[in-house]
């Protein structure tokens, strides 16, 4: 569960990332493909557009932490769509690792242990929500 302190830490530190959003997204994908080159073929389209979509999704998620009842259905839909792209449960851990690394690079000294824990918690909740929604799509296919 995400505490109010964690929610506020994520929102305040994300505000510091917004001015460098394109660079942060570029760093994220560079790191993702560095630690998991097998994921590169999943991204066939324009990476400029992909970076923009990543930051739009992160912005919506961070803002949505104030309105979880509205955020959860959006995140579930995202999880179902990602299942169709071939995303597997194990990929979420890799994405989380790349995200935390990117935040550390972007925030520098502001990326404290508490900030890291807050982001890891929020990402964990979002990733679990996406994985559960993806299973709802995949399970009927496997039966």
Language model feature labels by segment:
Residues 1-143:
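Globin-like tetrapyrrole-binding proteins
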